[in-house]
From Swiss-Prot:
This is Probable cytosolic Fe-S cluster assembly factor oxy-4. [4Fe-4S] cluster 1 binds at residues 25, 71, 74, 77. Keywords: 4Fe-4S, Iron, Iron-sulfur, Metal-binding. Pfam families: Fe_hyd_lg_C. Residues 38-60 are annotated as: Disordered.
Length: 439
């Protein structure tokens, strides 16, 4: 079926029906008996029934209120409810939350900034200043770069790999909520024991805001409003904050801002004011976080070795580290982007043919730079061109800073158990949706 330009709808070729976006969910909580109708529908979607059930009175579906997180996590949706719920996450609601809180914090991903910078033809540095200026003008106290939280995740990644027995490998990155949701619902027993327990940068940023900044400001976590602007909608699955935004939602606000306000001179130059100063933290290894590259760097720093990288296809990369004395391969890591490649990885793991030690897994082809919440373009050629520009801008971002260690030490003084907030756990999800729908 060719791309017709429709968005947020279900469209069937060669059929007169057209389903417009609506908030109705296909999963009812309660039902009541109604009279059976005799007309013959043009398109019929039904669960398989026994003969005894054929004439049983049907029941109405009661209106249900569900959260966006629940909607995105549900694998039974064949309506456009998910799209509409995403659209309901408006900045009007976000600004209302900011006004009603004692302290508001916004976390923004560098992928979002670079995507929007390409669209608006601005430098990431100037755009970061504009975004921070807009939110600070509307009452946000801190506008944070999610890359700062990613540094906490990176600092724990290699240690976690060392603690993972070779029989339990490969260790799979946990930064992509789309992949984690897929693992929990489809291959729980196989994948969940192998997924990294380190929280994603967005989740760690939430822990920093609610667990560190709140304590530092003398506030309860519930008094703090925390919103995130991320490269994909699936981030809502792991976001326990108050709101979620994406690149396209920021665009009009940034256009309205025009000129960024200067940062007050007395404000300290640190991780809480970096975006206001146009400082965005980059990372070696691409726009999906550079987890695989960080593992390789830490391994080589401790053990030495010869690093060799090969591109298997545009969404799969393999890196090996060879011993400088024996030439033996002592470490294997990979990057696997896109569900087609993810499914190939799962098949290899099922047959125990996957010998990799660590895999950076992302559900989207192209990784986070091509996330569903990034700026979208009409044609495939335009998308690929813009994606290359986003990746180029991301690669040019400055690397690292010295702020993480000082925050870690102060956080430890405020909460001796702070490290527990940097880890999570997963479990298989049992679905209640019938899998026997007949078209």
């Amino acid at each position: 079926m060719e791309d017709s330009g429709f968005s947020g709808v279900v469209r069937l070729s060669n059929v007169s029906d057209f389903i417009a976006p609506n908030l109705d969910c296909i999963i009812p909580l309660e039902t009541r008996t109604v009279e059976k109708k005799n007309e013959e529908p043009q398109v019929n979607i039904r669960a398989k029934k026994t003969k005894n059930e054929e004439n049983k009175p049907k029941e109405d579906k009661k209106s249900v209120k569900i959260s966006l997180a629940d909607c995105l996590a549900c694998n039974g949706c064949i309506t456009s409810a998910e799209t509409v719920l995403v659209e309901e996450q408006s900045f009007g609601r976000l600004l209302e939350g900011i006004r009603n809180s004692k302290m508001a914090v916004i976390t923004i991903s560098p992928q979002t900034i670079t995507s929007l910078a390409v669209k608006l033809e601005k430098t990431p540095e100037d755009l970061a200043k504009l975004i921070a200026s807009f939110f600070r003008r509307h009452g946000v106290k801190y506008v944070l770069d999610s890359s700062f939280a990613r540094q906490f995740a990176h600092s724990l990644a290699y240690e976690e790999l060392l603690l993972t027995p070779s029989t339990s490998r490969p260790l799979l990155s946990s930064a992509c909520p789309g992949f984690v949701c897929y693992a929990e619902k489809s291959h729980g027993e196989l994948l969940i024991p192998k997924i990294s327990k380190i929280r994603s940068p967005q989740a760690i940023s939430g822990a920093i805001v609610k667990g560190y900044l709140a304590k530092k400001e003398g506030l309860s976590p519930c008094d703090v409003f925390h919103a995130a602007v991320m490269p994909c909608f699936d981030k809502k699955l792991e976001h326990r904050g108050n709101s979620l935004g994406t690149a396209e939602l920021l665009e009009e606000l940034v256009k309205e801002e025009g000129v960024a306000e200067d940062v007050e001179e007395e404000e300290e130059n640190n991780w809480t004011t970096s975006l206001s100063r146009g400082i965005i933290i980059g990372e070696d290894g691409g726009a999906s976080g550079g987890y695989a590259d960080r593992i390789v760097r830490d391994f080589v720093a401790q053990n030495g070795g010869i690093v060799k990288t090969s591109k298997l296809n545009k969404n799969m990369f393999s890196t090996t580290v060879e011993s400088t004395t024996t030439g033996e391969i002592v470490l294997r890591v990979a990057k696997v982007y896109g569900f087609r490649n993810v499914q190939n990885l799962v098949r290899k793991m099922k047959t125990k043919k996957e010998k990799t030690d660590y895999v950076e897994v992302m559900a989207c082809p192209g990784g986070c730079a091509n996330g569903g919440g990034q700026v979208r373009y009409e044609t495939m050629d335009e998308r690929e061109k813009r994606l290359a520009q986003v990746e180029e801008l991301y690669e040019a971002l400055p690397r690292g800073n010295s702020w993480e260690e000082s925050v870690r030490e102060e956080w430890k003084r405020l909460d001796t158990n702070y490290k527990n907030l940097l880890f999570t756990d997963y479990k298989p999800v049992e679905t209640n949706v019938a899998q026997t729908l007949k078209w």
